[in-house]
Amino acid sequence: MENRTNFFHLHLISDSTGETLISAGRAASAQFRSAQPIEHVYPLIRNRKQLLPVLQAIDDAPGIVLYTIVDRELASLIDERCTEMGVASVNVLEPVMNAFQIYLGAPSRRRVGAQHVMNAGYFARIEALNFTMDHDDGQMPDDYNDADVVIIGISRTSKTPTSIYLANRGIKTANIPIVYGVPLPEGLLVATKPLIVCLIATTDRISQVRENRILGATQGFDREHYTDRAAISEELKYARSLCARHNWPLIDVTRRSIEETAAAIVALRPKLR
């Protein structure tokens, strides 16, 4: 009998780097061995304009929402929209801050990123996060030579969460989807500075994750083709051929956590440490 992993969507919304949320989400999900989260990380969300696309993404792929947003208006908007969608939302810091306020008899400052020391390392991480968000999913292809790392791979190989994890360590990371039969952007092919690495996984793993990705999605997917194992095998074959042609390294993420994948990438170029 096939031992299938159940996947669920875990949305992590932060007005800072997102490290607190990522740690909390992984600590909680580790207690449920039968289910594995598909992480969607949204750092540096500080106004309504930035938040609205995030809420749409949650509506497209419902799951659990954890957030650390100190702005009360934005936090209320998250809760209201999640209630409308029938999605559980948890303000991770609010119970802790309330306990502090009661004990100390003083209100919190509600200052974004207050836990971070404003040193050069912090600003480098913020710069890397901004770069990574601007260059997610093939955006701004003319800037790839400004990246430290460019991650490529077919859909559902953990490109975005790995990019965010690296950015939280000050590594400017872009990611580009490999689409079967579609040439890669010229900006990538002429880039000389970044480490270019391709993420792959087994056909079964990708099919399972894609099946869970389209749960609740009402449009935008050719469902049968998107999860078809034969089609996925062809996509992987195409990705491997591109990497062989350009001598780009491959990392299999099937049994790797995001942290392990990031460590494997950094190991390919020690100066990133």
Curated annotation (Swiss-Prot):
Family of this protein: Belongs to the pyruvate, phosphate/water dikinase regulatory protein family. PDRP subfamily.
Signal peptide: none
Taxonomic lineage: Bacteria, Pseudomonadati, Pseudomonadota, Alphaproteobacteria, Hyphomicrobiales
Enzyme class: transferase
Native source species: Rhizobium etli (strain CIAT 652)
Catalysed conversion reaction: N(tele)-phospho-L-histidyl/L-threonyl-[pyruvate, phosphate dikinase] + ADP = N(tele)-phospho-L-histidyl/O-phospho-L-threonyl-[pyruvate, phosphate dikinase] + AMP + H(+); N(tele)-phospho-L-histidyl/O-phospho-L-threonyl-[pyruvate, phosphate dikinase] + phosphate + H(+) = N(tele)-phospho-L-histidyl/L-threonyl-[pyruvate, phosphate dikinase] + diphosphate
Protein name in UniProt: Putative pyruvate, phosphate dikinase regulatory protein
One Pfam assignment: Kinase-PPPase
Keyword Nucleotide-binding attributed: yes
